[in-house]
């Protein structure tokens, strides 16, 4: 993918690995896969979710600044509603990705190994990263399709498939891992039922299983009644904290969590071990769990910061988006439930008639959220916290941020200039090519001479127009250099055939008195010394 990510097959011939180089020593031989899976829940909670969050922050910061500086028809494109539709999820996704990331690494800090949260976090954050980068490319448009040192999105765009694929491909994580594992590991009764069924003492196991099973049935009935009552009441029967005007969201989350719990129980009881083959159902249930998790993470993130009021539009956008996604995922699971006879009862329990009206954020809230990454406010700084920022005109990101600052500082001057140009006769301006790239100085001199711009405003205006033109330019390369680069790249790439499989070495006989194997004790230093000696022509 033309990205610095070392990934591929590894093989060797007569490779010797000293025992001291084996993780865990001799006791852990043959247990590498187990150790890998145990560590995966930790690494998967940190690396790729952080990558997705960072990419989302960068995309929102740079694209919001670019949208402000890019003008069309005499207006910033950030004022166009079509562009705002792309800027809106950029800001919202960056906010909720960061909230979910912090919630999950907080579990790691407490010594928890969150296998299910890490799986859904990796899946969702990398998926939102893909959406964010695609939205950013839509806004940047032609400015983003030429790869080169000026392009601040190309590398992130190229790296998206890697993040989607590694550490558990998203398509399998969604359809198999998140709900398939979570439904069993997180259920209050399933694990105990399995343990009772495996009990070597059949009498004791049957007695334990009966007690747990009846508790499971009562749990399912309670979930059904709770889902029905909360569904009809719109969650109003649930006691919720009265903080920061979030009561409606708490109630909807309580209502849908009851529906999710009921649907989980019914799925396990009716589908059982066939859940692995019902990957569409498992995927929709995973989407429901993801929406519940991210909505909870957003509320906690805002709470931990003390409910700053300027973040409320972003919080509401994230909650409304996740609740709408949660509703759609649960409805899809109910409408396509693999046992047709249960579809109508589940629909009445989870979605009482006339009590489902969630449609996601409206246009008014969307415009406010889009402005969060366009306007120079503390909210924009908070959203981009931790993101590398500079205003170096020779840097791909710094070029955009420098033009953004100069454009904001001279906005009133440029508005005055544009208004004067619109009022002038075309014949008067016929000798001036109003192209910022070619005759900026002539245009500024004309504006100063006409009294439109003062002498003190000349240099700031010229600097801003220069930066605004420079941020629009794409990279241009000499054809001969491109040809040499292509030939060099082609020459460095060579298809390597996989080595033929070798016969496994015969296992040595153990010593009869100890049962251990006769293994020559060697160290890495000894092997290095022997290798160097073999290459010494004088040896």
Name these PLM-found stretches.
Residues 514-517, 523, 533, 538:
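Acidic/Ser-Thr/Pro-Gly-rich, low-complexity N-terminal segments
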């Amino acid at each position: 993918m033309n990205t610095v990510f070392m990934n591929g097959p590894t093989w060797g011939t007569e490779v010797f690995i000293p025992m001291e180089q084996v993780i865990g020593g001799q006791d852990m031989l043959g247990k590498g896969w187990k150790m890998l899976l145990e560590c995966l829940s930790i690494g998967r909670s940190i690396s790729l979710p952080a990558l997705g969050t960072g990419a989302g922050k960068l995309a929102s910061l740079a694209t919001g600044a670019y949208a402000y500086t890019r003008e069309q028809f005499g207006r910033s494109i950030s004022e166009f509603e079509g562009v705002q539709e792309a800027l809106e999820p950029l800001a919202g996704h960056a906010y909720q990705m960061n909230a979910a990331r912090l919630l999950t690494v907080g579990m790691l800090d407490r010594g928890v190994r969150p296998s299910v949260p890490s799986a859904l976090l990796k899946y969702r954050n990398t998926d939102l990263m893909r959406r964010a980068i695609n939205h950013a490319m839509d806004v940047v448009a032609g400015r983003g399709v030429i790869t080169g040192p000026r392009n601040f999105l190309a590398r992130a765009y190229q790296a998206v498939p890697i993040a989607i694929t590694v550490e558990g491909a998203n398509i399998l994580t969604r359809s198999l891992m998140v709900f398939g594992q979570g439904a069993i590991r997180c259920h209050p009764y399933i694990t105990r039922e399995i343990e009772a069924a495996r009990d070597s003492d059949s009498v004791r196991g049957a007695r334990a299983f009966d007690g747990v099973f009846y508790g499971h049935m009562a749990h399912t009935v309670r979930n059904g009644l709770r889902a029905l009552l909360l569904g009809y009441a719109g969650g109003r029967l649930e006691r919720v904290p009265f903080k920061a005007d979030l009561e409606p969201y708490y109630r909807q989350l309580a209502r849908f969590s009851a529906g999710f719990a009921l649907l989980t129980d019914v799925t396990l009881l009716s589908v059982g071990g066939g859940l692995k083959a019902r990957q569409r159902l498992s995927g929709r249930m995973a989407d429901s769990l993801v929406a519940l998790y991210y909505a909870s993470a957003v509320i906690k993130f805002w709470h931990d910061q003390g409910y700053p009021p300027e973040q409320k539009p972003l919080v509401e956008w994230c909650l409304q988006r996740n609740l709408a996604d949660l509703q759609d995922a649960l409805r899809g699971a109910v409408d396509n439930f693999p046992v047709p006879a249960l579809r109508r009862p589940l629909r009445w329990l989870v979605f009482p008639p006339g009590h489902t009206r969630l449609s996601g954020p409206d246009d008014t809230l969307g415009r406010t959220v889009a402005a969060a990454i366009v306007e120079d406010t503390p909210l924009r700084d908070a959203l981009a916290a931790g993101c590398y920022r500079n205003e170096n005109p020779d840097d791909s990101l710094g070029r955009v941020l420098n033009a953004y600052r100069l454009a904001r500082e001279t906005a009133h001057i440029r508005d005055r200039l544009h208004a004067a140009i619109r009022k002038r006769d075309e014949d008067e301006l016929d000798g001036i090519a109003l192209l910022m790239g070619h005759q900026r100085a002539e245009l500024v001199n004309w504006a100063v001479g006409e009294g439109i711009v003062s002498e003190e405003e000349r240099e700031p205006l010229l600097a801003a127009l220069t930066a605004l033109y420079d941020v629009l330019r794409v990279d241009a390369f000499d054809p001969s250099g491109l040809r040499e680069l292509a030939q060099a790249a082609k020459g460095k790439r060579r298809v390597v055939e996989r080595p033929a499989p070798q016969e496994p070495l015969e296992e040595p006989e153990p010593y009869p008195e100890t049962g251990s194997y006769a293994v020559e004790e060697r160290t890495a230093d000894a092997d290095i010394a022997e290798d160097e000696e073999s290459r010494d022509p004088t040896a």
